[in-house]
Amino acid sequence: MKPVVVLDTNILLDVLVFDDSRAHPLRAALMAGSLDAVATQKTLAEFLDVIGRQQFLLSQEKQDQIMFQWRSWSRLINDEVLDIAPWKCKDRDDQVFINLAYTLKPAMLISKDKMVLKIAKRAQKDGVVITSDHNRVFSDDFSLKTAEL
């Protein structure tokens, strides 16, 4: 069974826009289809909004290519079927990522958002690993935890 992975917007920027070397193994796994990367319309809309911002200087064509790539790697889940996680994030825009990981647990949410990372200990008790480490999904401890759940 492939590990279920939710990637927040900042991690997607590392993978698809910034070409961050720390994200290269994650990108390779996404390209190989060895992860069950999941998204919703709301998470796609947020990512599209962010990459469309002036600071990134991405042409419409480049934005379309990036979105096409992410959609080809990810499985789309309907926002309407998401369970509400018992932990709340102060940043309401990030709650959808938390709810998505909670719905599909055991799952990993990779995020650099400090508000999201604050709930990591509580989430882990319910089968959701929250980490800022791009490559924790490849660690033995994550594989063992998901196998136990």
For every predicted segment, state its role:
Residues 6-7, 23-54:
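PIN/NYN-family metal-dependent endoribonuclease catalytic core
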